[in-house]
Design a protein with these regions (language model features):
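Phosphate/dinucleotide-binding and metal-coordinating scaffold of catalytic cores
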Residues: 1-173
Length: 173
């Protein structure tokens, strides 16, 4: 079970009756009050425990800011790209729902399946600040991982480097 692959959604609605009827399992990580819902075929308690333990290890590494430890566990480019996408769309959902992670058995944790940009593209306003999702004063909480990562100079440098790489494409479109 320690090498189980999985797909999870970070979703404040994870504890709903609808998910219970679907047979979906959820759990919390320390310091968070939003559910991680197991969306993949994880059937046993041992598999569920392995998924939670692995995600907890990743969570602790991210919050620690230890880049070397994070690179052992996560696909860092997927985190950089997802952060940029969430920032460009100013997507308020990222801190509370529709945030997916996946891991192939034995692989690294990846941010995947960008989803649910209706609020970011016009049906909701977070007009308190134009400085991004992790700024203080925003009405919607940031995702704790992005908030922690933006406190790391090396992550900001990775984001800036990637933005410089994709900027010409963005300016063309």
């Amino acid at each position: 079970p320690a090498q189980v692959g999985y797909l999870l959604e970070y979703d404040f609605r994870g504890d709903t009756e609808t998910n219970a009827r679907k047979g979906l399992t959820y759990f919390y990580l320390p310091g968070t009050d939003i559910e991680w819902v197991i969306k993949s075929e994880v059937y046993t308690e041992a598999e569920t425990a392995a998924v939670r333990a692995h995600l907890l290890t990743c969570h602790e590494a991210i919050l620690s800011g230890d880049r070397a430890r994070m690179e052992e566990l996560i696909d860092l480019p997927s985190f950089v790209d997802m952060f940029i996408l969430q920032e460009l769309s100013k997507n308020p959902d990222v801190g509370t729902s529709s945030f997916f992670v996946q891991r192939d058995a034995g692989g690294k944790l990846c941010l995947t399946a960008p989803w649910d940009f209706d609020f970011g593209f016009g049906t909701y306003s977070t007009g308190v600040s134009n400085l991004g999702l992790v700024t203080s004063g925003d009405k919607v909480p940031p995702h704790p991982w992005f908030a922690a990562l933006m406190g790391q100079k090396w992550f900001v440098e990775e984001v800036l480097s990637r933005m410089a790489e994709i900027r010409p494409f963005l300016e063309e479109t």
